[in-house]
Amino acid sequence: MPELPEVEVCRRGLEPELAGQVIQGVVIRAPKLRHEIPPALATLLPGCRVVAVRRRGKYLLLDCERRGVQGTLIIHLGMSGNLRFVPFDLPPAKHDHFELVLAGQILRFADPRRFGVVLWQPGPPASAECHPLLATQGIEPLSEMFTAEWLYEAIARRSGPIKPTLMDSHLVVGIGNIYASESLFRAGISPLRAANRVSRARYEILVPAIRETLSDAIAAGGSSIRDYVHSDGGAGCFQIQAGVYDRANQPCLRCGGVVRQIRQAGRSTYYCTGCQH
């Protein structure tokens, strides 16, 4: 599933070509995704100008305006979705479900597994935060509010393992499986350690590790593990730089210990038995 870095890379790829554009038309081929695409978008969006392309957690937010009427198109890429700019003469593929017709090109949304979201929130940009999908989202890990002190206090009463706790989007948004494993590796913290058994001093190490991991992933274009591609069709390469992710039974790049793979909350976790405690 595309996580914060992949969605941020997507946002940065879309913004230069999309912001300021007037939507010429909308095509809805298969409305039944995780939530049904509102059919009203076909008449609501044409003529709207995209005034900003934002991100909240793993959601893309396209703020639109037409003659003083405002609203936000909320997009989630789901498990396998992607947004690509394509020429008018490129025929749609089997899993191309939704598109915005622009001046000179099309922004096309493909989603083979149909877990994505394309929804509309009327009102000014700030009202998007009131949408049920966004209202319960946690703190942004790249924001100034995300500090060691905040995380220590927020997790003080949580006794579950630290790795699944970091992946709770109601607490912190966008730290997906690969980035939780990599952040804990960089901080030298075992993913098995109870969240409330991590000391305040170690949170002072963990928070910068999370920030650095996410920032490095964004700089690398994200991680293309399965279906994820950029808006221009290119792939991310952070997975090549990973210290522990997908390196089960290989020597640790830091200490030479063995990288182990286990299951936590139904997801694969990778960590070094030698230098993560």
UniProtKB/Swiss-Prot annotation:
<dbReference type="InterPro" id="IPR000214">
    <property type="entry name" value="Znf_DNA_glyclase/AP_lyase"/>
</dbReference>
<keyword id="KW-0456">Lyase</keyword>
<feature type="active site" description="Proton donor">
    <location>
        <position position="3"/>
    </location>
</feature>
<dbReference type="InterPro" id="IPR035937">
    <property type="entry name" value="MutM-like_N-ter"/>
</dbReference>
<keyword id="KW-0863">Zinc-finger</keyword>
<feature type="zinc finger region" description="FPG-type">
    <location>
        <begin position="243"/>
        <end position="277"/>
    </location>
</feature>
<keyword id="KW-0479">Metal-binding</keyword>
<dbReference type="GO" id="GO:0008270">
    <property type="term" value="F:zinc ion binding"/>
</dbReference>
<feature type="active site" description="Proton donor; for beta-elimination activity">
    <location>
        <position position="58"/>
    </location>
</feature>
<dbReference type="InterPro" id="IPR010979">
    <property type="entry name" value="Ribosomal_uS13-like_H2TH"/>
</dbReference>
<comment type="subunit">
    <text>Monomer.</text>
</comment>
<dbReference type="GO" id="GO:0140078">
    <property type="term" value="F:class I DNA-(apurinic or apyrimidinic site) endonuclease activity"/>
</dbReference>
<keyword id="KW-0326">Glycosidase</keyword>
<keyword id="KW-0511">Multifunctional enzyme</keyword>
<dbReference type="InterPro" id="IPR012319">
    <property type="entry name" value="FPG_cat"/>
</dbReference>
<dbReference type="GO" id="GO:0034039">
    <property type="term" value="F:8-oxo-7,8-dihydroguanine DNA N-glycosylase activity"/>
</dbReference>
<keyword id="KW-0238">DNA-binding</keyword>
<feature type="active site" description="Schiff-base intermediate with DNA">
    <location>
        <position position="2"/>
    </location>
</feature>
<feature type="binding site">
    <location>
        <position position="95"/>
    </location>
    <ligand>
        <name>DNA</name>
    </ligand>
</feature>
<dbReference type="Pfam" id="PF06831">
    <property type="entry name" value="H2TH"/>
</dbReference>
<dbReference type="Pfam" id="PF01149">
    <property type="entry name" value="Fapy_DNA_glyco"/>
</dbReference>
<feature type="binding site">
    <location>
        <position position="158"/>
    </location>
    <ligand>
        <name>DNA</name>
    </ligand>
</feature>
<dbReference type="InterPro" id="IPR010663">
    <property type="entry name" value="Znf_FPG/IleRS"/>
</dbReference>
<dbReference type="Pfam" id="PF06827">
    <property type="entry name" value="zf-FPG_IleRS"/>
</dbReference>
<dbReference type="GO" id="GO:0003684">
    <property type="term" value="F:damaged DNA binding"/>
</dbReference>
<dbReference type="GO" id="GO:0006284">
    <property type="term" value="P:base-excision repair"/>
</dbReference>
<comment type="similarity">
    <text>Belongs to the FPG family.</text>
</comment>
<keyword id="KW-0234">DNA repair</keyword>
<dbReference type="InterPro" id="IPR015886">
    <property type="entry name" value="DNA_glyclase/AP_lyase_DNA-bd"/>
</dbReference>
<keyword id="KW-0862">Zinc</keyword>
<dbReference type="InterPro" id="IPR020629">
    <property type="entry name" value="Formamido-pyr_DNA_Glyclase"/>
</dbReference>
<comment type="function">
    <text>Involved in base excision repair of DNA damaged by oxidation or by mutagenic agents. Acts as a DNA glycosylase that recognizes and removes damaged bases. Has a preference for oxidized purines, such as 7,8-dihydro-8-oxoguanine (8-oxoG). Has AP (apurinic/apyrimidinic) lyase activity and introduces nicks in the DNA strand. Cleaves the DNA backbone by beta-delta elimination to generate a single-strand break at the site of the removed base with both 3'- and 5'-phosphates.</text>
</comment>
<dbReference type="InterPro" id="IPR015887">
    <property type="entry name" value="DNA_glyclase_Znf_dom_DNA_BS"/>
</dbReference>
<feature type="binding site">
    <location>
        <position position="113"/>
    </location>
    <ligand>
        <name>DNA</name>
    </ligand>
</feature>
<protein>
    <recommendedName>
        <fullName>Formamidopyrimidine-DNA glycosylase</fullName>
        <ecNumber>3.2.2.23</ecNumber>
        <ecNumber>4.2.99.18</ecNumber>
    </recommendedName>
</protein>
<keyword id="KW-0378">Hydrolase</keyword>
<feature type="active site" description="Proton donor; for delta-elimination activity">
    <location>
        <position position="267"/>
    </location>
</feature>
<keyword id="KW-0227">DNA damage</keyword>
